[in-house]
Amino acid sequence: MTLYRFISNNILFKFDPEFIHDCMQVILSNKFAPYLTSLYSTSNKHISKTYIMGQELNSPLALAAGFDKNCAILKALDKLGFGYIVGGTVTINPRPGNLKPRITRYVDNNSMVNSLGFPNLGVEKIIENLSNYDLKTPLIMSISGDSISDITELYKLLSDYCFGFEINISSPNTEKLKYFHDYNNFENLIKSLNDIKSKPYMIKLPRFGISTLDQKSKSIYEKYFQILSDNNVDGLVLSNTFPVEDSILKVGQGGLS
């Protein structure tokens, strides 16, 4: 048994998962945390460099959105050797997210289900946090909203703080995002982003289909892909978590990772 497995099984997994995550956020926000995380950094000299949206990366391994929703611990994460980090997901106004409990573990399957619903401090506070950093690791900002105007405003406000964007219309825990699952609304969003484009962006699509990718799901994806191709979108993220029901969660459902 590894040290991590011993600690997680015997200590961390005894507590609520969101509580543990919040505790780690506090620890990693300490001014000494970057020195601690640098001890666990590995050299990338044997890892193939790659590119994403024109940006050279020292590693193809990245930290996905959701770990540092408020960009509060980027200094510590910057030392871990990721090819890039995705901050957020950020919304225009602060959001509390869904009611708790909103994360549960499936320890036997090495998996978890979350129904967070984009809890974050809002773009104003996150810009304040971002202003404190001079990162070596390339940063992508994940943004989302209930309307095209929300998303385009976030794009403009955050463009000075990252090399690109991940447009998140994929969360299974945010009901209003289904507005963008309509093909016309989706394409209007893309066109609106292209009208103000100053940085590259990629679209994060939701999971379609059940356990297998049936013909109906393939047709849905093909339609989205065609829209992305026709409008010269820089990248695509596939896909968000798998929607499941779980009575432990306050809202009764979430996304399986």
Feature roles, as predicted:
Residues 94-101, 123-127, 173-198, 212, ...:
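Active-site-adjacent beta->alpha loops and helix N-cap segments on the catalytic face
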Residues 25, 29-43, 115, 172-185, ...:
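Glycine/Thr-rich beta-alpha phosphate-binding loop at enzyme active sites
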Residues 2-138:
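N-terminal capping/small domains of soluble enzymes
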Residues 111-114, 120-137, 182-202, 253-257:
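Alpha-helix-loop-beta-strand connector modules within alpha/beta enzyme cores
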Residues 140-153, 178-186, 200-229:
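Active-site glycine- and acidic-residue-rich loops that bind
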Residues 86-98, 162-170, 234-242:
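Non-cysteine beta-strand/loop elements that form the S-adenosyl-L-methionine
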Residues 66-68, 90, 144-146, 170-172, ...:
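Active-site beta-loop-alpha junctions enriched in small/polar residues
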Residues 61-65, 85-87, 114, 139-143, ...:
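Hydrophobic faces of well-ordered beta-strands that scaffold small-molecule active sites
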